[in-house]
A protein has these predicted regions:
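Conserved beta-strand hairpin/beta-sheet module of binuclear metal-dependent hydrolase folds
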Residues: 40-90, 195-207
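Active-site HxH/HxHxD metal-binding segment of metal-dependent hydrolases
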Residues: 89-169
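N-terminal secretory signal peptides that target proteins for export/translocation
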Residues: 1-10
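Metallo-beta-lactamase
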Residues: 30-38, 133-186, 191-192, 200-201, ...
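C-terminal regulatory/interaction regions
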Residues: 275-316
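Bacterial N-terminal signal peptides
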Residues: 13-24
Length: 316
């Protein structure tokens, strides 16, 4: 297990003290985000189905935590320091145990920018082996979004990358005290940085953005890889899935199959469009439209998905 050295935290934690304290002061009057216990010791806050635009406030992803007998694991920390602070405050309403791990399911900004709230000597950050690089590559872009939509200056858009890294198709088990969780990394799918977290005690899987319920699924990696990863997840022995966006469900196979069917339809219709020399804009206007009534934010996201996969599939 890789851990930060003590002087690392002295160096990097101290500059955060003022920022974290100041942020708590700013947002002290804000309503706390709410959590639901979806299985014993598993708490989830469900983000809103909003786009990253003028309506964005850093709270669109599902975030939460798992409580063991000795410690706690945070699963995704939200889209801002504000959300991270509210998550940290909410945890203390349910347990006084220390947070031992913060796990990021992937690189997207709505899942990672609360990490700084949990920096401490005994906290390890866990993620995909590609996550540190991906975070660094997107840093400036994310800072612009946080400044424009959240009014967060760059010195408060703090990235904390994982120090425990998991390679694709491998997993590691972490014990929270009579409660083991398994973190599994995948090859490119939703992104190049996807991991899932399985609570072995309750057979609950945190899928991150490998599963969307209600909201239109997002492809920021590879559509073929996404379809393949869903096939792997469908083979798991689990009872419940917590998606990255949308309502946790015990009808998890139906949820994954619905998502996979959308991807297969989109893949086939985009391939047909390319074979017929149809241009990108016409394909955006037509492909996948039979799915439009099944998903929220479809008119926004379906076109983005096509814009992502069309040029990739042209080279196949």
């Amino acid at each position: 297990m890789i851990r930060y050295r003590k002087n690392f935290f002295l160096k990097h934690s101290l500059p955060l003290i003022f920022i974290l304290t100041f942020s708590v002061f700013i947002y002290a009057s804000s309503p706390s985000i709410e959590f639901k216990e979806v299985a014993p010791g598993i708490f989830v806050h469900q983000g809103e189905h909003l786009d990253v635009d003028e309506t964005y406030h850093g709270d669109i992803a599902n975030i939460g935590f798992i409580v063991g007998e000795e410690s706690i694991a945070v699963i995704d920390s939200g889209g801002s320091l504000k959300i991270g602070n509210e998550l940290k405050t909410a945890i203390r309403k349910f347990s006084k145990l220390p947070v031992r791990y913060v796990i990021n399911t992937h690189v997207h900004l709505d899942h990672i920018y609360g990490n700084a709230s949990f920096v401490g000597e005994n906290v390890d950050f866990i993620g995909h082996v590609e996550l540190p690089k991906a975070m660094a590559l997107r840093k400036e872009f994310y800072e612009r979004i946080n400044l424009e939509y959240l009014d967060v200056p760059n010195d408060q858009s703090i990235q904390i990358a994982p120090n425990i890294l998991i390679k694709p198709n491998e997993n590691k088990i972490f014990d929270l005290g009579n409660r083991k969780i398994k973190v599994t990394a995948y090859s490119i799918a939703h992104t190049k940085t996807d991991v899932t977290i399985e609570d072995l005690k309750t057979k609950t899987l945190w899928a991150g953005d490998l599963l969307f319920t209600e909201r239109t699924p997002v492809i920021d990696g590879d559509i073929h890889g996404f379809i393949d990863v869903i096939d792997k997840i469908l083979m798991l022995d689990i009872d419940q899935v917590i998606p990255g966006h949308g309502t946790p469900t015990k009808k998890w196979k139906e949820a994954f199959l619905k998502e996979q069917n959308y991807f297969k339809l989109l893949r086939d219709e985009v391939r047909l469009a390319i074979d017929n020399d149809q241009d990108l804009q016409l394909t955006i206007d037509t492909a996948g439209q039979s799915e439009s009534e099944k998903w929220e934010l479809f008119d926004i996201q379906n076109g983005r998905n096509i814009n992502k996969i069309f040029p990739m599939m042209e080279w196949e």
